[in-house]
């Protein structure tokens, strides 16, 4: 009887320790899987689509750039017009403002009526002197001390010169925009047979493993066939791995978590059964 009692006690402790280790192992894996699933779901929910962010950034950047450019142009034009008028003096300031307005009108594309641009008031060039070139600025400042009629004639000539320069620049731009010759398109039919030859080994790789492992393959073709036979073997992948490779991150690891749940349940049931059996035996022996 003493031997049976000691054996039952030893058996009880062995079963308890063994089942505690198994339960802790399965519980740790279950907790880790649940934690990983929660992290994946939170990542998928927190990451917004890239298209919306790109369009929002583009619109915001465009509006900000336009407003900044407009404000900078207005402030620069105002400061330039004010300084030119102040340095020229009373009557000379008026003529300088008129010449600056005429040149600005030609730069903005209003060259059809340069006289109207030249006859503007001295206060108007503050907003139109932003697009004038260095030649226009020199012409306007050099004619600030002369008579107004002479200033108007010289501004008309400067407007004509700027129009001619703009026409020359447009011609050069149209010449630079000529599309290149389509040599690559004429050479493309010659590349098609090479593509067909390159596609031939891929078709041979899709053959059965018996034909690919045959010793008849010689030269460099054998190396390619060996790779094809290795790559064409079916891989023993589980459902969870297929879901992970397909891109379903939400379902990734779902099957493994279910298996772990079932194993946890089985281990718990086993643990309960063993404890109950050992307790029954121990009480029966001790009593």
Swiss-Prot record:
Example GO BP: cell adhesion
Signal peptide: 1-20
Composition-biased stretches (Polar residues): 150-180, 187-215
Stretch list, region 12 X 4 AA tandem repeats of S-A-G-G: 55-102
Keywords, in A-Z order: Cell membrane, Disulfide bond, Glycoprotein, GPI-anchor, Lipoprotein, Malaria, Membrane, Merozoite, Repeat, Signal
UniProt-listed InterPro entries: MSA2
Keyword match Membrane: yes
Region (Polymorphic region): 44-213
Covalently lipidated residues, kind GPI-anchor amidated asparagine: 261
Sites where a glycan is attached: 22, 36, 164, 236, 260-261
Membrane topology per record: Lipid-anchor; GPI-anchor
GO cellular component: plasma membrane; side of membrane
Propeptide, residue positions: 262-287
Bias-annotated ranges (Low complexity): 121-149
Disulfide bonds: 244-252
Region (Disordered): 42-248
Predominant location category: membrane
Mapped Sequence repeat ranges: 55-58, 59-62, 63-66, 67-70, 71-74, 75-78, 79-82, 83-86, 87-90, 91-94, 95-98, 99-102
Cell compartments where the protein resides: Cell membrane
Gly residues bias locations: 54-112
Keyword DNA damage: no
Function per UniProt: May play a role in the merozoite attachment to the erythrocyte.
UniProt remark on domains: The N-terminal region appears to be involved in lipid binding.
Protein name: Merozoite surface protein 2
């Amino acid at each position: 009887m003493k031997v049976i009692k000691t054996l039952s006690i030893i058996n009880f402790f062995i079963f308890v320790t063994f089942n505690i280790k198994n339960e802790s192992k399965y519980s740790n894996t279950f907790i880790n899987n649940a934690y990983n699933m929660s992290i994946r779901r939170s990542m998928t929910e927190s990451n917004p689509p890239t298209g919306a962010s790109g369009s929002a950034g583009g619109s915001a950047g465009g509006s900000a750039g336009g407003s900044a450019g407009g404000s900078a142009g207005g402030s620069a034009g105002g400061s330039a017009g004010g300084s030119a008028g102040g340095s020229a003096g009373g009557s000379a300031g008026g003529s300088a403002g008129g010449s600056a307005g005429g040149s600005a009108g030609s730069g903005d594309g209003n060259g059809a009526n340069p006289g109207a641009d030249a006859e503007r008031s001295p206060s108007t060039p503050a907003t139109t002197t932003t697009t004038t070139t260095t030649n226009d600025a020199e012409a306007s400042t050099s004619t600030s001390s002369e008579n107004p009629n002479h200033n108007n004639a010289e501004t008309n000539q400067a407007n004509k010169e700027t129009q001619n320069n703009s026409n020359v620049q447009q011609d050069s731009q149209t010449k630079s925009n000529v599309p290149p010759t389509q040599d690559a398109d004429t050479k493309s039919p010659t590349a098609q047979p090479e593509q067909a030859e390159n596609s031939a080994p891929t078709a041979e790789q899709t053959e059965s493993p018996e034909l690919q492992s045959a010793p008849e393959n010689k030269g460099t073709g054998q190396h390619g066939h060996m790779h094809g036979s290795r790559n064409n073997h079916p891989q023993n992948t589980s459902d969870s791995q297929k879901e992970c490779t397909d891109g379903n991150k939400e379902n990734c690891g779902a099957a493994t978590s279910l298996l772990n749940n079932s194993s946890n349940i089985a281990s718990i049931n086993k643990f309960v059964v063993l404890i109950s059996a050992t307790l029954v035996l121990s009480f029966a022996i001790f009593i």
